[in-house]
From Swiss-Prot:
It comes from the Eukaryota. GO terms for biological process: DNA damage response; DNA repair; response to ionizing radiation. GO terms for cellular component: nucleoplasm; nucleus; SOSS complex. The gene is inip. Transmembrane segments: none annotated. Keywords: DNA damage, DNA repair, Nucleus. Component of the SOSS complex, a multiprotein complex that functions downstream of the MRN complex to promote DNA repair and G2/M checkpoint. The SOSS complex associates with single-stranded DNA at DNA lesions and influences diverse endpoints in the cellular DNA damage response including cell-cycle checkpoint activation, recombinational repair and maintenance of genomic stability. Required for efficient homologous recombination-dependent repair of double-strand breaks (DSBs). Its main location: nucleus. It is found in: Nucleus. Belongs to the multiprotein complex Integrator. Component of the SOSS complex, composed of soss-b (soss-b1/nabp2 or soss-b2/nabp1), soss-a/ints3 and soss-c/inip. InterPro entries: SOSSC. This is SOSS complex subunit C.
Amino acid sequence: MDPGSTASPLQCTAGFPSKNRVAILAELDKEKRKLLLQNQSSTNNPGASIALARPNMNKDFRDHSEQQHIAAQQKAALQHAHAHSSGYFITQDSAFGNLILPVIPRLEAE
């Protein structure tokens, strides 16, 4: 930086992250185009459809093993909650990833 420059050192370093971001975005765009080209070539190649059918079986197996793992985690969490709490809990799928949910009784209005 020359003495006649009015830019502060902070302003010079502030531009660096934006250049870095541009480089990262360019690299991501390049990868995206590469993947799109690979996807197009695999759909044009009839032999590729056979290879694409296999991962679904692996996915089903993985989903099943994940469900078993979650069921084991739910059972352990439920046992722990019942042992250490006076409340009542149930296992239920939760949009927030909770393995167990507390049951809260409804009281009639007096």
